[in-house]
UniProtKB/Swiss-Prot annotation:
GO CC annotation: cytoplasm
Residues where Mg(2+) binds: S21
CDD domains: EF1_alpha, EF1_alpha_II, EF1_alpha_III
Ranges for region G2: 70-74
Residue positions binding GTP: 14-21, 91-95, 146-149
Gene name in the database record: tuf
Name of the protein: Elongation factor 1-alpha
Assigned keywords, A-Z: Cytoplasm, Elongation factor, GTP-binding, Hydrolase, Magnesium, Metal-binding, Nucleotide-binding, Protein biosynthesis
Location(s), subcellular: Cytoplasm
Organism of derivation: Methanosarcina mazei (strain ATCC BAA-159 / DSM 3647 / Goe1 / Go1 / JCM 11833 / OCM 88) (Methanosarcina frisia)
Length: 422
């Protein structure tokens, strides 16, 4: 059963039309995670619309189309098992808020598959996603050179694309020699579950084998305790029960904890998971817990719980490294968008633009730039408009990443480099 296997969050990244959805659909179908009757139904529908090649992509259909056709695919179907792990596919880019989801919280990916279409090679979005995944701390990567059927399974073309992608990976500190580059056709299923006879020249692993040889993510249980609060309930006879997912550290019954930025604290009376009381909670556990002396007004979404002797850091201001993904004009000092970090959403002001970086190499390109635009990477000083918990990414990576949102879109992604505490 899945619970006995280590769990991995897998991001599937790459340019919008390079076949990510078909790739994920095929992976899940071949791994037995999608009932055959659903696929048959899609094949039939796709055929009628003259879009036969979309059968697998339809498995991963975006919400809008699902609603139009009155079908929904439960998120549970985005899980699949291999011999070694059970995987959850976290949102593919292109899905709404991918970047925000990737940065904040539950969908923190442990590894990524980069899908690059053989006919097109590297596109702008390919670069952006590689850089972003690096910024977000993903350090295990598998490259699928997809749509090989469209280039007649040409080894020469495969080598050209490997060359292109390796160049970018090197620039941002990945070692191409440690990364499998797998020629695939998600539509035909080549080199997904097993090696294909259409690519006799390819000697590496198929996708499944590459997934099985990923390294299990280390549980950050030795780090200080941090539990971002998702919500707080009042339960009669018990009192106030905050709920959230343990990001780092271990919490035991009887521990003295504190909720920041508010500062209310007390002793842990009980911890519950899946409606059962447990003696301690470890990273990844979704729990409800009750703290003696904590009232309804002492704790809210966005607070972070930690041990009283090592409380979460509350920033008066902090220095962040950001990548600007999109902005209609330019960003200057004084800009005050909403920052999403763990479960908090707080307006923060960019009080200084310190350095502009070369997004490919991380080298300083310009000191004290006057503005930033889409595609720029920078070091900036940020002042939250109200108290906010954030941690340097080197100390507690799970609480060091953030997304910047404005005008209904993700403007930038970033990580906290240092905190000046209140």
């Amino acid at each position: 059963m899945a619970a006995d296997k280590p769990h991995m969050n897998l991001a599937v990244i790459g340019h919008i039309d390079h076949g990510k959805s078909t790739f994920v659909g095929r992976l899940m179908y071949d791994a037995g995670a999608v009932p055959a009757h659903i696929i048959e139904k899609y094949k039939e529908e796709a055929k009628q619309k003259g879009k036969e090649s979309f059968a697998f992509a339809w498995v991963m259909d975006s919400l809008k189309e699902e609603r139009e056709r009155g079908i929904t695919i439960d998120i549970a179907h985005k899980r699949f098992d291999t011999d070694k792990f059970y995987f959850t596919v976290v949102d593919c880019p292109g899905h709404r808020d991918f970047v925000k989801n990737m940065i904040t919280g539950a969908s923190q990916a442990d590894a990524a598959v980069l899908v690059v279409a053989a006919p097109d090679g590297v596109m702008a979005q390919t670069k952006e996603h590689i850089f972003l995944s690096r910024t977000l701390g993903i350090n295990q990567l598998i490259v699928a050179i997809n749509k090989m059927d469209a280039v007649d399974y040409s080894e020469a073309r495969y080598k050209e694309v490997v060359e292109q992608v390796s160049g970018i990976l090197k620039m941002i500190g990945f070692k191409p020699s440690e990364i499998p580059f797998i020629p695939t056709s998600a539509f035909h299923g080549d080199n997904i579950m097993k090696l294909s006879d259409k690519t006799p020249w390819y000697k590496g692993p198929a996708i499944m084998e590459a997934l099985n040889s990923l390294k299990e993510p280390e549980k950050p249980s030795t780090l200080p305790l941090r539990i971002p609060v998702e919500d707080a309930y009042t339960i009669s006879g018990i009192g106030t029960v905050p709920v959230g997912r343990v990001e780092t550290g271990v919490m035991k019954k009887g521990d003295k904890v504190v909720f920041m930025p508010g500062g209310a604290g007390g002793e842990v009376k009980s911890i519950e998971m899946h409606h059962e009381e447990i003696p301690q909670a470890t990273p990844g556990d979704n729990i409800g817990w009750n703290v003696r002396g904590i009232g309804k007004n002492d704790v809210r979404r966005g607070d972070v719980c930690g041990h009283a002797d090592n409380p979460p850091k509350v920033a008066d201001e902090f220095v962040g490294q950001i990548v600007v993904l999109q902005h209609p004009s330019a960003i200057t000092a004084g800009y005050t968008p909403v920052f999403h970090a763990h479960t908090s959403q707080i307006a923060c002001q960019l009080i200084a633009l310190n350095k502009k970086l070369d997004p490919k190499t991380g080298q300083v390109k310009e000191e004290n730039p006057t503005f930033l635009k889409a595609g720029d990477a920078a070091i900036v000083t940020i002042k939250p408009t109200k108290p906010m918990v954030i941690e340097p990414v080197k100390e507690i990576p799970q609480l060091g990443r953030f997304a910047i949102r404005d005008m209904g879109m993700t403007i930038a992604a970033g990580m906290c480099m240092s905190v000046k505490q209140k």
